[in-house]
Amino acid sequence: MVTHALRVGNTFGLAVFRAGAGYALRMAPRRIVSLVPSLTEALFAFGVGERVVGRTRYCTQPPRCVGGVEKVGGTKKVDVGRVLDLEPDLVVAVREENARESVEALRAAGVPIFLGAPETVADALEMLEKLAGIVEAPRAEAVIGPIERVYEGLRRARPVRRPRTFVPIWKGPYMGVGSDTYVHDVIEVSGGENVCGAHTRYPIVSPEEIEAFQPEVVLLPDEPYPFSAEDLAEFYALDIPAAHGDRIHLVDGKLLTWYGPRMAGSLRQLSALLRLP
């Protein structure tokens, strides 16, 4: 019997890792549908990829492994009927990425749901540990151990000064990341000071407000909004230290938003970008 409980909290009324009573699966799941791209990658890294029978069209990693896995729609628009046809004994979802309606429909159909709600790097680590336990992952330590070591190293490092950092996740209008988001904690753990940290969720900010923030580093991710080289000129035109010091960087959005095996490398890369000369 799998003894790792899925704790039922008040988010969606489903399984989240926060508070409340729990229930346990009777055995390790054999037919898993993942609705979260980064956790699909994690399941393969854990050594249980052969049990993944369904994925979203955005679950593209690892590319050599997911090609033969059935697609069940997108992260927000899941084909619930297709998921049920696959007869899963576990569906993996995350509050921030998946639509409440889809997850509730699957739960109502009696499908066990693993629903994570990570708002910090520590939350993400706990989520990975719980998922690894539930699926009885043979390679859990190989995946999670390096992340824990990098995370603890960065926590101990405590930079003398944290550069003011702006990370937009959208354009038209620009949207930053507030203090209750996973990206905020990634910035802070990596050594930066999120200039939108006084806000919650995803605040809309104008170019004038960005100038008022006076960010020393700007990171432009390629997801969810696909910032590209064409957007650099708009930020270099602003009167901000990041422009004067040539510290406006295009980055892979997965560095900021993906949980799983790439977290250790992501934190290392971000800490290097946020280290002032």
Question: Which residues make up each language-model segment?
Answer:
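Short linear motifs in low-complexity or flexible loops
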Residues: 3-5, 15
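Short terminal hydrophobic/aromatic SLiMs and anchors at protein ends
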Residues: 2-3, 10
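N-terminal ligand-binding lobe of clamshell/alpha-beta domains
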Residues: 12-277
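Compositionally biased, low-complexity segments enriched in small residues
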Residues: 6-7, 23
